[in-house]
């Protein structure tokens, strides 16, 4: 699985973090996929995450974070995840927690 696909799956995890995949979040993920030229189905990814990780988003997040190793890919993934988090117009507690866990996993150098 490419780093781009892992980044998109991380975006799906962020969208699911607040207990729902909203239309705004789905649209933002599809927009990102188009920008990076990846054919990506958000609903298939959601199903895969729920099946593969039994709905445990922390485990899914750790898995996808660990699969993104290049510095520029980490910076890009961080920006994508932030865009998804803000796409519905508000940043919820679980989304903040998701970003904090990213910072802890990758280190402070990837966050402004």
Regions found by a protein language model. Give the residues of each.
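Small-residue-enriched hydrophobic alpha-helices in membranes
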Residues: 1-112
